[in-house]
């Protein structure tokens, strides 16, 4: 075969693989399934591909969804639900079985990126004591399966773990959560895994109307709103994220990266919830996360929008929980949004 042809083919293949791998700032989408009117998993994954959504977060494993993801080249964050924490923490064989069933059986065709062990586990939850042991057992199972270089194990927290968040440099964890956060941080540092953070400027804004400006929450403020020398903050997203980084730095986690595993703006059910505000927030977010925060400028922020669809069976209150979808159940977009 002509060596020049081989060289050209190699170059083309190299370009193909470079162009189909998501960058750090490529925004993914959360795929929740609490609805009785949603498209099938196969239709949904086809929608992801059509819209160039290259990463997905799943809150629990589902064989139909995982089968639909085979060969899609979409990177997957797979959730281990809170209800599994005790059994997985108490038995390495249970952890091994979970990884075999939901990861190994699909690993040849599905690009697993993270396993989120638990989601927003509260210190008051009866299963909180099992969180870190479950993370450790799942990590051992991943390593035993030979996937340690491919899949990072972490957990998802929300901003409620912070005692202070204003100004961002004052960010610190609540004293009562440290019994769980300290071992989480030690584990993540030892594994070079990121912390997954569910971050909603909407809830901060809606809970403090009159104190937090809407344009600050939507990335539309014309100039800096919060001064935190030597930094200035023009949007609430950066301020919240840097507050979490500040808390990590004070607790042995200065080396950790944060993945924003959920964010978005609802289109109904609450204060200033409408299609226009959701369009503004999500489109501005997609552009913004390529640039980093004042504390970590130039560092792309891996981020996941919540969510692909409205979910009419989400437990309420608050009623706003039902209205976070980017698309209607008929797969039509609520508003223009560009993932390219």
Curated annotation (Swiss-Prot):
- Enzyme class at the top of the EC tree: hydrolase
Q: What is its main location?
A: secreted
Q: Which residues form the signal peptide?
A: 1-25
For this record, an example GO cellular component is: extracellular region
| UniProt GO molecular function | glucan endo-1,3-beta-D-glucosidase activity
Which reaction is catalysed here? Hydrolysis of (1->3)-beta-D-glucosidic linkages in (1->3)-beta-D-glucans
Pfam families named in the record: Glyco_hydro_17
Subcellular localization: Secreted
Keywords of this protein's UniProt record, alphabetized? Glycosidase, Hydrolase, Plant defense, Secreted, Signal
Q: Which InterPro entries does the record match to this protein?
A: Glyco_hydro_17, Glyco_hydro_17_plant, Glycoside_hydrolase_SF
| EC number per UniProt | 3.2.1.39
Q: Where is the active site?
A: 120, 262
The superkingdom listed in its UniProt entry is Eukaryota
- GO BP annotations listed: carbohydrate metabolic process; defense response
Please state which protein family the record places this protein in.
Belongs to the glycosyl hydrolase 17 family.
- What the protein does? May play a role in plant defense against pathogens.
Protein name, entry field: Probable glucan endo-1,3-beta-glucosidase BG1
Origin organism of this chain? Answer: Arabidopsis thaliana (Mouse-ear cress)
User: What lineage does UniProt assign to this protein's organism?
Assistant: Eukaryota, Viridiplantae, Streptophyta, Embryophyta, Tracheophyta
């Amino acid at each position: 075969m002509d060596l020049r042809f081989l060289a050209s083919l190699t170059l083309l293949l190299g370009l193909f693989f470079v162009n189909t791998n998501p960058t750090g700032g490529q925004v993914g989408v959360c795929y929740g399934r609490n609805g009785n009117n949603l498209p099938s998993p196969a239709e949904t994954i086809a929608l992801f591909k059509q819209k160039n959504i290259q990463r997905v977060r799943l809150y629990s494993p589902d064989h139909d969804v995982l089968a639909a993801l085979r060969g899609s080249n979409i990177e997957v964050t797979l959730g281990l639900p809170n209800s599994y924490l005790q059994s997985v923490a108490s038995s390495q064989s249970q952890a091994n079985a979970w990884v075999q069933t939901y990861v190994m059986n699909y690993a040849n065709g599905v690009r697993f990126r993270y396993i989120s062990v638990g989601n927003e586990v509260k210190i008051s939850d009866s299963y909180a004591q099992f969180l870190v042991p479950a993370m450790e057992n799942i990590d051992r199972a991943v390593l035993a399966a030979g996937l340690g270089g491919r899949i990072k194990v972490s957990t998802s927290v929300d901003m409620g773990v912070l005692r202070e968040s204003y100004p961002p440099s004052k960010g610190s964890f609540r004293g009562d959560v440290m019994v769980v956060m300290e071992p989480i941080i030690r584990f993540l540092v030892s594994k070079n895994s990121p912390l997954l953070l569910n971050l909603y400027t909407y809830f901060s804004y809606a809970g403090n109307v009159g104190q937090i400006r809407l344009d600050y929450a939507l990335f539309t403020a014309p100039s800096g709103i919060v001064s935190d020398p030597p930094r200035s903050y023009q949007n609430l997203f950066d301020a919240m994220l840097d507050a979490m980084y500040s808390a990590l730095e004070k607790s042995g986690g200065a080396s950790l990266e944060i993945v924003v595993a959920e964010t978005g703006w609802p289109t109904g059910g609450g204060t200033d919830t409408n299609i226009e505000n959701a369009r503004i927030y999500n489109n501005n977010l997609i552009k913004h996360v390529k640039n980093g925060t004042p504390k970590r400028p130039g560092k792309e922020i891996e981020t996941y929008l919540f969510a692909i669809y409205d979910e009419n069976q989400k437990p309420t209150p608050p009623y706003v929980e039902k209205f976070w979808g980017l698309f209607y159940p008929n797969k039509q977009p609520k508003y223009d949004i560009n993932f390219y």
